[in-house]
Amino acid sequence: MTVDSKPQLQRLAADVDVDLMCRLLEEDGAFILKDLLPLDVVESFNRELDVQMAIPPPKGERLLADKYPPHFKYVPNVATTCPTFRNNILINPVIHAICEGYFQRTGDYWLSAAFLREIESGMPAQPFHRDDATHPLMHHQPLEAPPISLSVIFPLTEFTEENGATEVILGSHRWMEVGTPERDQAVLATMDPGDVLVVRQRVVHAGGGNRTTTGDPRRVVLAYFNSCQLTPFETYRTMPRETVESMTVLGQRMLGWRTMKPSDPNIVGINIIDDKRLENVLQLKATDLPA
């Protein structure tokens, strides 16, 4: 089979039936949603990220950013610093329809992390990997176990072959190990701003190398949704309460400010306090609840 004849990533309209989306995650392991985010939302998000990029890095240890090469810029915690993310993108109904189907065997889910990566010219391609480094438990799950993590990739600039569009190996979620795949086994997730790449747990993928010599860096926000049975990689418990109360109930749930319910046999939930729901003890307000 030649490279051109390989099965490619399915590109779906955002209003396609969610059952088809979930079926593609089980069959192919990934798909692209076209034009999920309106361009005005993308532009607003980019402006907020520009502000964060301009802030000098804090002094002292940075657990992740200090490990990255100079061609690679990183901004963590966009849920706290970017209103467009937490009040729009984080509560997108299509993303949550996918998550509800995807996590139906394990119960509620929440955001594990969301951060910006900006990849400049000269950045080499990543090694092929699975998104399981933050929670090694995932590496030990049997193939038949229900998925407990979902990666959602938001391109905020154009993704091309030249600037390092994500490389995805379809069907690799059924592999026992990552091994040492050849790059021609992968397909390219070329995308425009507003598109979204949805990737099932265990799928082998990599960021491509940025071979461009002119133009802007490739900008992407990576969001990871996990079963509420996994502790999030980023904690949002330090967000100001007034910021949290400017959000919807769904947004608050995603950021760990409400009690969550795993699947049975758990009958009371997790993230509880004094045997009560967290939100009730806090008397937490939300924009979509009566005053």
From Swiss-Prot:
Organism superkingdom: Eukaryota
Catalytic activity, as annotated: fumitremorgin B + 2-oxoglutarate + AH2 + 2 O2 = verruculogen + succinate + A + CO2 + H2O
UniProt GO MF annotations: dioxygenase activity
Keywords tagged on the record: Alkaloid metabolism, Dioxygenase, Iron, Oxidoreductase, Virulence
Pathway: Mycotoxin biosynthesis
Transmembrane segments: none
Requisite cofactors: Fe cation
EC number of this enzyme: 1.14.11.38
Enzyme class: oxidoreductase
An individual GO BP term: biosynthetic process
Quaternary assembly: Homodimer.
Role description: Verruculogen synthase; part of the gene cluster that mediates the biosynthesis of fumitremorgins, indole alkaloids that carry not only intriguing chemical structures, but also interesting biological and pharmacological activities. The biosynthesis of fumitremorgin-type alkaloids begins by condensation of the two amino acids L-tryptophan and L-proline to brevianamide F, catalyzed by the non-ribosomal peptide synthetase ftmPS/ftmA. Brevianamide F is then prenylated by the prenyltransferase ftmPT1/ftmB in the presence of dimethylallyl diphosphate, resulting in the formation of tryprostatin B.
Family indicated by similarity: Belongs to the PhyH family.
Protein name as it appears in the record: Verruculogen synthase
